[in-house]
Amino acid sequence: VVEAGRVYLTWGSPGTACLDTKSNDVLWTRDDFVCDHFRGAGSSPILYKNLLILTFDGADHQFVAALDKHTGKTVWRTNRSVDFQDLDTNGKPFRGGDLRKGYSTPLVIQHGGVAQLISIGAMACYAYDPLTGRELWRVTERDQHSASTRPVYGHGMVFYPTGFSKGQLLAVDPGGSGDSTETNIKWRTKRSVSNKPSVLLIGEHIFMIDDGGIASCIEAKSGEITWSERVGGNYSASPVTDGKRVFFFSEEGKTTAVAARRKFEILAESQLDGGFMASPAVHDAAWILRTKTHLYRIEKQ
């Protein structure tokens, strides 16, 4: 994550660093947050006020931590509270803790005048006080794991796919307290829900594409599916939008532009070498696209 004069990098357990963007000097590093990422780290850091917030959902340890962004010192650390209920007959976690890991990046929202850090882990979505790490509420979905998407917020609700296995898209009222599983889920859908690509909230509608190439438009307030159409290809990268169009990036290298409307319409398609696994970065009017073989900057001239 980048701000004026600084860039913050994390590789998960291998380390976290802060660099000066002008001098390239390393201002501080941390390598003492340890967990078994199992298949590698996937959660990005975020900034909130003077804090750099990190997520560690490993097979062995699961926690969220906040560092002072100026010094790298720990401000708070909070362990995940869900009971995974995944022990085998020998008292060991199933598949070495495979169901305990996660890859989601959190989001800070303002709801009812209160800041909440919305963080999706294995089997649960949590809300924390971003300044102290105190858990505010939790929604548990025990049959899902390896959540990879970032939540979105609007219309007084948090929207997020729950992860792999029996993944669903949930709409949650973030005004709860404690275990809110039975009280604060407003709607859910199981049809063509993405596991890896994050969802977009554009006005009154949620747009998403599942890993197998089915794109959907869903009414945010009700959960009613407006349309669901096969775009084709396989997907790991998250879509982006300019407010009028939604752009999907396939593992085969195809970019598909779809109208961000209630009626499904493909507006354009293009092809790049390699294929997309990483989500695009947007800088001013340009896209920074990383395929398996190339790094591209694309903008309108």
Segment roles from a protein language model:
Residues 1-301:
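Noncatalytic, solvent-exposed loop/strand surfaces
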